[in-house]
Amino acid sequence: MTTGQEAEQLARTYLEKQGLEYVAHNVRYPFGELDLVMRHQDFWVFVEVKFRTNTQFGGALQAIRPKQIQRIRKAANHYLQLNKINAPCRFDVLAIDGLQINWLQGCF
């Protein structure tokens, strides 16, 4: 795997196998982007996908910064408002380090 797009496709497939339903990907606003939008039971799930081919300079999880979390939250709120969605949501991270996948639910 060499691109972010491939990582997002792998993440989507992995999450669908875990029972989540795909809704959208790469939702972009001027102030932030949502990698994956999924549904899981009654929850809307906003998934940040992080990918690293090696961990020499830190793993995929270390790549998430507070400012990025702010942008993701803002984009998710905007998505919910635009689509008139009034339901619980959560923010997950799917970190891919080489061939290892770590799915963290409700991270922020």
Curated annotation (Swiss-Prot):
Gene3D superfamilies, A to Z: 3.40.1350.10
CDD domains: PoNe_Nuclease (cd20736)
SUPFAM superfamilies, sorted: Restriction endonuclease-like
Entries under InterPro entries matching the protein: Restrct_endonuc-II-like, tRNA_endonuc-like_dom_sf, UPF0102_YraN-like
Pfam families: UPF0102
Superkingdom assignment: Bacteria
GO molecular function list: nucleic acid binding
UniProt family annotation: Belongs to the UPF0102 family.
NCBIfam families from the UniProt entry: PRK12497.1-3, YraN family protein
Name listed for the protein in its UniProt record: UPF0102 protein Sden_0272
Source organism (scientific name): Shewanella denitrificans (strain OS217 / ATCC BAA-1090 / DSM 15013)
